[in-house]
Amino acid sequence: LIPRHDGVEHHLAGGDAVRAIVDVGRPPGAGAVGGVFLGDPGGGLVAQLQRNEYIRYAREVARRGARAWVLTGTASVLRVDVLRKVANARRDGALPGSYGVYDTLALTEDNELTLAIKTLGYRTMSPKECIVRTEVMLNWRDLWHQRMRWQRGALENLRHYKLSKVTRPYFVQQGIMILGMFAMWLFIGLTVLSAVTGSFQIQLLWLAIGLIFVVERIVTVWKGGYKSLVIAVPMVIEFVYDLFLQAVIIRSIFDIVSGRQADWYHPTDGANAAVESVPQPSASSESQDRVLTAR
């Protein structure tokens, strides 16, 4: 097993975590174990919104039987023999990229490696005992650049892997996000239109449905304590956050369609941050022209 982590704090070495790693990693079908990531403490409203988001994601992973959507770069443990198979599959053209474990031109290398491992027939797991903490962005600018990389990287990974049994759930996930985006803006538009035309009415049915949404938002972040609840209860705060994330989706799709150059953005402790351009990720058919290294 090879550990891989880049987070501020990780708890994969605890007794419960080690036992969980061994239990889920022992079967031949398990290719890697990733941590269930939560947000680092500190920061203001932007940081707390991310912590709420990560708490809900951890809950979702647990409800899926500890099956990981993505092997988090914060802390993961990977089988050596599986990584060798990934590298060989890249060399043979069965996976995107050329010889190496990581596709170093992928914007989201951890997501890409997850797809690679699953494509070879292995499971990726995230046991609830393997809690890790990752940094949160402290301002909207840093969060925008981070999520642009995540969203665009995820879309480009799917474009390279194409539709398959492995990628189908990811395509469905992206489709649901896009449909949800249209539904939300339709709701906003109809609400504004009814208010302008004077036809706006409060109906008990929709109030009841809204109450269900409020309860869901509260229950899903209950473990986060009062700070999480203060953000979740009003709903409007997280509603604005959802609109922000939807703007990321729209811009990511636009950048891909227009062929805009992707950027790596590195937030720093100071006021300045570095941005560097990276080569556009290529499909597997172009892998011979790429210079990739195994990490």
Predicted ranges, named:
Residues I176-R260:
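Membrane-embedded multi-pass helical conduit in multi-pass membrane proteins
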Residues E135-R152, I231, T268:
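Nucleotide-sugar-dependent glycosyltransferase catalytic core
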Residues A106, N111-R133:
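Catalytic donor-sugar/metal-binding loop of nucleotide-sugar-dependent glycosyltransferases
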Residues V8-V24:
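Acidic donor-binding/catalytic loop of UDP-sugar-dependent glycosyltransferases
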Residues V22-A106, M148, R159:
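Long helical/loop segments within the catalytic core of UDP-sugar-dependent glycosyltransferases
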Residues A273-R295:
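Short, intrinsically disordered terminal tails adjacent to the first/last structured region
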Residues N52-A58, D142-S164, V214, V248-I253:
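Catalytic core of nucleotide-sugar-dependent glycosyltransferases
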Residues L1-D6, V82:
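Active-site nucleotide-sugar/metal-binding loop of Leloir-type enzymes
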